[in-house]
């Protein structure tokens, strides 16, 4: 996939928002951080979180070259640690949730990092069959069932692309519950 593919995959999850405070969890070299910076524009701010310092450094160079007005803070951390972020307007997590074996604990933390009514964009392989590179696979059907238990009030599919690994990749948008009305 290229930058245009990344933007198209998450665009519907960001539509209607300009600016705001977002995070990209498990951001790696920043493919979706760049897409988020492109979609949010200069009014947005992004916290890019990954445990690989070299990947974050590479990402910072790309962001400076392609989106010099983007406000991005790189945070080197393990996603299972308490993160000094939030509450955010939205979080993107692309091809990273499948590395987390304690998914329920993590999702409880994740929902606390998002404002009520905030957005969570998940990009994952559409498979429940893992392998060494995708150890805890999470298909769209499994995520859809898991999202409500995790505290999201609404979850919908926003994109899908073919993948040479595990068939396809999906993007979904989940909105955090806003509490009783």
Q: What are these model-predicted stretches?
A:
Residues 20, 80-91:
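A short acidic, Gly/Pro-enriched loop at the edge of an enzyme's catalytic core
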Residues 89-103:
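A short SAM/SAH-binding and catalytic strip from SAM-dependent methyltransferases
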Residues 104-116:
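A short glycine-rich, Lys/Arg-flanked "PGG" loop and its adjoining helix->strand segment in the class I
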Residues 117-125:
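Conserved beta-strand signature within the Rossmann-like core of class I S-adenosyl-L-methionine
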Residues 161-181:
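Core SAM-dependent methyltransferase catalytic element
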């Amino acid at each position: 996939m290229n930058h245009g593919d990344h933007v198209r995959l998450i665009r519907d999850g960001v539509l209607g928002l300009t600016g705001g405070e977002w995070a990209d969890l498990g951001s790696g070299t920043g493919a979706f951080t760049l897409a988020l910076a492109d979609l949010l524009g200069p009014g947005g701010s992004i916290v890019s979180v990954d445990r690989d310092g070299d990947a974050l450094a590479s990402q910072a160079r790309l962001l400076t070259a392609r989106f010099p007005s983007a406000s991005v803070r790189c945070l080197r951390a393990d996603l299972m640690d308490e993160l000094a972020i939030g509450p955010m307007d939205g979080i993107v997590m692309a091809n990273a949730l499948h590395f987390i074996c304690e998914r329920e604990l993590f999702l409880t933390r994740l929902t606390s990092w998002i404002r009520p009514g905030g957005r969570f964009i998940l990009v994952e392989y559409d498979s429940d069959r893992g392998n060494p590179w995708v150890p805890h696979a999470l298909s769209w059907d499994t995520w859809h069932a898991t999202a409500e238990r995790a505290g999201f009030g609404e979850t919908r599919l926003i994109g899908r692309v073919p993948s040479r690994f595990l068939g396809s990749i999906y993007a979904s948008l989940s909105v955090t519950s806003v509490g009783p009305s």
